[in-house]
């Protein structure tokens, strides 16, 4: 039949009785004509429509058939076209029922009472499948559709376009020749020799390509002898696959799997390319195994041309009451050292019962040079200590108990550290017990230490202490006061040493401490600042007084198991003890005064400015020192501390601090950190750090500055850099330069890093990474290096060509 288009303003004639129609070959019953006529008006041709065995209707009757179509409401015209609409909402398919079919076209012809031929903008929809073409033949008995000319098949979020296609529509079975295809979930496209539709989820593509680039600018594509796609499992498998980058093959694999969505899937991750002065060309191609929702494994095959083949693995797991991670690397027969190189790291936590937990943290490397030779970051390469620890913790109400063994692997040239074999620790913490805060800590530890590199044995022994603390916080609007009492009782049992056989082996100490912390907060409007910045500001003034008293106890013969001098700063100046650990308790008769002022946005509560100044006065002088006793201490004031943090302007951040000695008129410590971040991926960081050499810092002076940043060079290219310089040594500490380029479907990164290593030499490395959007999305080591070295760094991402809701609208 031939459809005659109606003007939008022309109404359908009243339909006569259909039984009077005839054809050249026989009568076509109304039950057969009705679905075909209604289909042209936008109604469904349901599978339940009953056609008799009459012949094809008479072509001469076409006009009368169209004119007798039932009247249906017309949608508003669009550019003069009639837009068909359903007179009633389509009925929902019940479970077990076959879904109805919907057909439309410029010309529609029925045959064999159960078939239909559509020509011109032909379209068939059934269930979730859509078949289109210049000409489309559909047989309801076999549910077969054949599209010829500009055939389009849409199903399961995928669209295929080719010269012809044949489909069993409800079963989603069929094929298409020479298709172009598009995947909605990933934005990927490709071409093929043939595509076979197995069912609604699976398809097989022969001689296929795949890319997430725009079809007109495919910088990279993946070609394969065969692609097996499974939308239910959301994974694709390629056989005989080759990855092309700017038409150059760069990688291949006999079998290759890749995700069809952003969900976690097994497959290759971003390859990592690098070059090291000692390792040569360095290539890593990680492979990710999605074993289960709660377990995964990543293998890191790594080839270093100057050393050999290295294999690394990272296994993670989590379950009901337990979790853990195992990382390991092995390099058999390193060509540089003629030895096997390896490392491992294992962490595990286990819930044994309610409140009872066990843990393991084991880390080790094969030799002292492993971090310098085989790690990829400055932090890893300078690590000289690896912990091995296992323990059990128990928590019940206000009680906490810890039992652990802690050992270390210390690499040369660093000296060994004390190990806990074992430690038993218990704490009781109770807040607001009749207004009091109560804490009691008891500890037993046996300290052991390996021989030094020269064979010297340092002191070893056992330490037991009990330290109860009680405070009474008084907090009122605008002010607070907290008196506190601490009592420390410590007992040492030392092991005899061959080099000092007559030395005393038993020590004990009981030391009380009293402190009183108090402060006030005054608040007012800041009209001047409000006028300048156009924002309502509040200003605070917060004075603070802190007094501490501890009597002197001679501790010059006590060992130093876990105690060091705290760096002088705000944390130390308002504390009861200037030492960390429990081997030293300083004698105190000190008063600290501090003053803080803040500017706060009244509407948002954001702190835009904070300035603090503080100083401590020692009334009697401190005799207890980290390495002995000062015989004649003098009273006096400490260094003056001042610090400020400023964020008054959007995108600007300033943090500065200074430690000034009024007596010597020297600056003993200062730091400055400035950051400018006007937009995402636009940042500039400037830092400076200075420390004068003192006995507390082991005569180690610091005078360093650094600058780092990230900035767009073009719309798609970004530069990243860092430079740190030591003025005392008059040499570079470390430097980094990198370039990132974001295309529509890939991101390229090249990073060069040079840093001073532990042997006073320099290590230089180059990293190169290409990340293909939709094929490999997990970043690798260059991202970690950039995040560690450039504060605020944001990795660039691919910038796909924008699409609209009208693209691939099927």
UniProtKB/Swiss-Prot annotation:
Gene Ontology cellular component annotations, sorted alphabetically: cell outer membrane; transporter complex
InterPro entries reported in the protein's UniProt record: LipoPS_assembly_LptD, LptD, LptD_C
Signal sequence, start to end: 1-49
Pfam families: LptD
Coiled coil: none
Keywords tagged on the record: Cell outer membrane, Membrane, Signal
Region feature (Disordered): 1-26, 54-79
Keyword Signal in record: yes
Keyword Membrane found: yes
UniProt record, GO biological process: Gram-negative-bacterium-type cell outer membrane assembly; lipopolysaccharide transport
Subcellular locations according to the entry: Cell outer membrane
Major place of residence: membrane
Protein family: Belongs to the LptD family.
Function of the protein: Together with LptE, is involved in the assembly of lipopolysaccharide (LPS) at the surface of the outer membrane.
Quaternary structure note: Component of the lipopolysaccharide transport and assembly complex. Interacts with LptE and LptA.
HAMAP family: LPS_assembly_LptD (MF_01411)
PANTHER family: LPS-ASSEMBLY PROTEIN, LPS-ASSEMBLY PROTEIN LPTD
Protein name as annotated: LPS-assembly protein LptD
Native species: Cupriavidus pinatubonensis (strain JMP 134 / LMG 1197) (Cupriavidus necator (strain JMP 134))
């Amino acid at each position: 039949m031939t459809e005659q288009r109606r003007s939008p303003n022309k109404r359908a004639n009243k339909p006569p009785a259909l039984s009077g129609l005839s054809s050249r070959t026989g009568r076509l019953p109304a039950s057969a004509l009705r679905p075909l006529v209604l289909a042209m008006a936008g109604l469904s041709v349901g599978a339940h429509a009953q056609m008799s065995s009459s012949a094809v209707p008479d072509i001469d009757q076409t006009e009368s058939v169209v004119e007798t179509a039932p009247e249906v409401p017309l949608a508003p015209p669009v550019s003069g076209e009639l837009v068909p609409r359903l007179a009633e909402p389509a009925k929902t398919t019940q479970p077990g029922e076959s879904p109805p079919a919907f057909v439309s076209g410029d010309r529609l012809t029925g045959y064999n009472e159960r078939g239909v031929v559509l020509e011109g903008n032909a379209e068939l929809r059934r269930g979730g499948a859509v078949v289109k073409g210049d000409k489309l033949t559909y047989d309801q008995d076999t549910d077969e559709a054949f599209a010829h000319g500009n055939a389009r098949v849409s199903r399961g979020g995928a669209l295929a376009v080719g010269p012809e296609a044949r489909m069993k529509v409800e079963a989603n079975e069929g094929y298409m020749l020479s298709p172009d295809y598009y995947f909605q979930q990933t934005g990927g496209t490709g071409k093929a020799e043939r595509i076979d539709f197995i069912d609604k989820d699976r398809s097989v593509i022969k001689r296929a390509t795949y890319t997430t680039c725009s079809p007109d600018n495919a910088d990279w594509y993946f070609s394969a002898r065969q692609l097996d796609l499974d939308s239910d499992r959301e994974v694709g498998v390629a056989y005989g696959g080759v990855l092309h980058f700017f038409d150059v093959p760069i990688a291949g694999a006999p079998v290759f799997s890749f995700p069809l969505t952003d969900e976690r899937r097994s497959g290759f991750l971003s390859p990592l390319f690098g070059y090291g002065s000692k390792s040569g060309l360095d290539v890593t191609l990680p492979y990710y195994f999605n074993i289960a929702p709660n377990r995964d494994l990543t293998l890191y095959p790594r080839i270093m041309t100057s050393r050999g083949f290295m294999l690394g693995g990272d296994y993670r797991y989590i379950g009901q009451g337990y979790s853990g991670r195992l990382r390991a690397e092995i390099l058999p027969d390193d060509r540089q050292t003629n030895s096997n190189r390896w490392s491992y790291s294992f962490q595990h936590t286990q819930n044994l019962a309610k409140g009872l937990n066990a843990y393991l943290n084991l880390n080790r490397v094969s030799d002292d040079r492993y971090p310098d030779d085989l790690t990829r970051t400055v932090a890893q390469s300078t690590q000289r200590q690896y912990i091995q620890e296992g323990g059990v913790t128990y928590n019940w109400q206000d009680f906490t108990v810890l039992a652990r063994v802690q050992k270390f692997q210390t690499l040369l040239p660093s000296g060994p550290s004390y190990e806990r074999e074992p430690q038993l620790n218990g704490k009781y913490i109770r807040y607001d017990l009749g207004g009091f805060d109560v804490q009691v800590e008891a500890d037993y530890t046996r300290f052991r230490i390996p021989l030094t590199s020269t064979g010297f044995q340092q002191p070893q022994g056992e330490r037991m202490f009990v330290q109860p603390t009680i405070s009474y916080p008084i907090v009122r609007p605008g002010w607070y006061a907290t008196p506190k009492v601490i009592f420390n009782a410590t007992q040492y049992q030392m092991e005899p040493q061959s080099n000092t056989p007559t030395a005393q082996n038993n020590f004990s100490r009981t030391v009380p401490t009293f402190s009183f912390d108090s402060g006030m907060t005054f608040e007012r409007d800041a009209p001047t600042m409000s006028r300048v910045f156009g924002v309502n500001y509040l200003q605070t003034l917060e004075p603070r007084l802190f007094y501490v008293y501890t009597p002197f106890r001679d501790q010059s013969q006590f060992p130093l198991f876990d105690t060091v001098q705290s760096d002088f700063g705000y944390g130390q100046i308002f504390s009861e003890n200037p030492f960390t650990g429990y081997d030293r308790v300083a004698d105190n008769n000190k008063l600290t005064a501090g003053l803080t002022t803040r500017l706060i946005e009244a509407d948002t509560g954001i702190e835009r400015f904070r300035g603090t100044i503080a100083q401590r006065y020692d009334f009697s002088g401190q005799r207890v020192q980290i390495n002995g006793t000062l015989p004649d201490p003098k009273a006096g004031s400490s260094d003056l501390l001042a610090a400020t943090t400023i964020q008054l302007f959007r995108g600007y951040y300033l943090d500065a601090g200074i430690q000034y000695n009024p007596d010597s008129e020297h600056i003993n410590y200062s730091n400055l950190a400035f950051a400018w971040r006007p937009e995402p991926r636009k940042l500039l960081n400037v830092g400076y750090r200075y420390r004068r050499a003192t006995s507390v810092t082991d005569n180690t002076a610091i005078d360093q500055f650094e600058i780092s940043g990230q900035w767009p060079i073009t719309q798609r290219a970004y530069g990243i850099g860092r430079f740190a310089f030591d003025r005392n040594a008059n040499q570079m500490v470390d430097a980094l330069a990198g370039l990132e380029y974001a295309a529509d479907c890939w991101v390229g990164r090249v990073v060069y890093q040079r840093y001073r290593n532990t042997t006073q030499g320099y290590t230089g490395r180059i990293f190169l990474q290409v990340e293909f959007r939709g094929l490999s999305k997990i970043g690798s080591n260059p991202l970690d290096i950039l995040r560690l070295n450039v504060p605020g760094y944001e990795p660039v991402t691919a910038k796909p060509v924008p699409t609209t809701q009208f693209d691939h609208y099927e």
